[in-house]
Amino acid sequence: MAADESPASPSELSECFSAEDYAAESLAADLDPWITFDARKTPRAEFSSWLQSHRPSSVSRYGDGEAGAGPVGWIAVRGPDYSEQSGDVEGLQDSWETLLTSGRSVSFQNIRELALNHSVLDGKWLMHLDTGFKVDRAWESIARATVLEGKIWSAKVSPRDPSSNSRHVICVYNQNFTDEEQVVRLDSAIRAAGVKCVLYYKPDVYTYLGIYRNNRWKLCPTIYESMFDLESVPRRSHILNKVTNLELS
């Protein structure tokens, strides 16, 4: 899984930071140690105690020297059907450099073509939550749906950053961002877990290519937005394709 968006929500991110700043921050988190529960390797009987011991609001991003705890990049869970499939990232980045030097326009369609050519197809729904009860409750629901129910492939959450006012980000993954039905099914699984907040969907190819907020190509860093409608019967998500500006039916 690649590094992701800042824990701050899109509306909170400062215009003074460049896409390169956000990419560097995310890469640093990705390279630091992760706390991971892998349902393929660890008995499920140990999951509840693991979950309680590693609540995102109580795990410090930069560790605790007095307690002998080191930095933590992410807290992650992997479901029983999880498999590593990052594709040909090096080839993707080489093709990206070729595109940039060719003079061709940079667009979602061109990037989608690169992703398909190099099998870099993972994507994730992102949610931004305040530290404390809100993030701990949402993370517990997502993690249980991943490890115990197998409804979600994999997920991760950022630990608490005591040095800033940034919120936590939870990333919930699927295997193919070009499969619209799969993207919608993952949204449904997240909503079934009890999450009602706004969600944003980002393909991993954007992350690998450094496409964050304030990028020089002026691309929106997310391609779907999901708003949960509490008043509809039955309750449902309204998912907007931000590339076409059309709502998914």
From Swiss-Prot:
Pfam families: Bles03. It comes from the Eukaryota. InterPro entries: Bles03 (IPR015034), TIF_eIF4e-like (IPR023398). Disulfide bonds: none annotated. Belongs to the UPF0696 family. This is UPF0696 protein C11orf68 homolog. It comes from Danio rerio.
